[in-house]
Amino acid sequence: MTFKAGKRIFSAEDKFNSLYAIRSGAVKTQKYTYSGTNRISDFFFPGDLVGVESIGGSAYHNDAITLSDTTVCELPFNLLETLCDSIPMLRREVMILLARKIRDSDQMMANGRTLHGEVRLLLFLRDLYQRYGTQCQDGSVRVRLPMSKNDIACHLGLRPESLSRALHKLQCDGMIRNNAKSIDLLNMETNINMLCGQ
C-alpha cells in the first residue's frame, strides 16, 4: 500500500485490525488530548511496525500520518496471531518489540520531566541516528528530518521557540550542524555525556 505525504494510514478510534510495516518513507503517530492539545507520540521509519500500542484494544490508540510518500505492508493482526502460535521465534520477536516500545515510552516520560531541552533534543537525534542515520566522511553522523521542527517540538514536549533556542545553542557550541532537512551530530556520545553530567 502506498500513501502520499500527509495521508492517514489509520485514525484514532478506527477499529483495530492490522499492524503496518514501513517499507519506505516515514510516519508520525499523534493523538489529541482531552484539552485539545496535539501530542506526537512517535516517528516511524523503514523496518518499523506502526500500531503496536493498539494491541489488546478494539480501536487504534492514535492517528498514523505519513510524513512523506510512504509504502507500507499491511499485517492483519489475526494472521499475525496465528503465525505467532506456530512460530515461537516470531512470537519472541513480537514480545521484544512490545517490551522495547514500553521502555522507550517510559524513558521519554522520564526525560521530559528531568532533562533540559538541549539534552532531550540530542537524545532524540541519537535515537534517530541509531534507527536510520548515516555516517559522514568527517566522522560526524547525519540524521534526515522528514518531520517538521514543530513536530519535533511537540514530540519532545517543548515549545517551538524553545526548540529553536536549543538548536541555536547546540550549533553555537559546535555540537551540531543544523541544515534545512537534516542535522549533523559532532562528537555525539561525548557531548551527550557532558550535557547529562551538568
Q: What are the residue ranges of the model-derived segments?
A:
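Phosphate-/nucleic-acid-contacting segments
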Residues: 130-198
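Cyclic-nucleotide recognition modules
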Residues: 40-103
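Short beta-strand segments in beta-sandwich/barrel cores
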Residues: 8, 26-31, 49, 71-72
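Regulatory nucleotide-sensing modules
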Residues: 1-24
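Polybasic "coupling" helices that flank or enter modular domains
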Residues: 89-157
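Alpha-helix/helix-capping structural signal
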Residues: 24, 78-79, 100, 150, ...
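Residue-level signal for tight coil/turn positions that link beta-strands
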Residues: 24, 68-69, 180
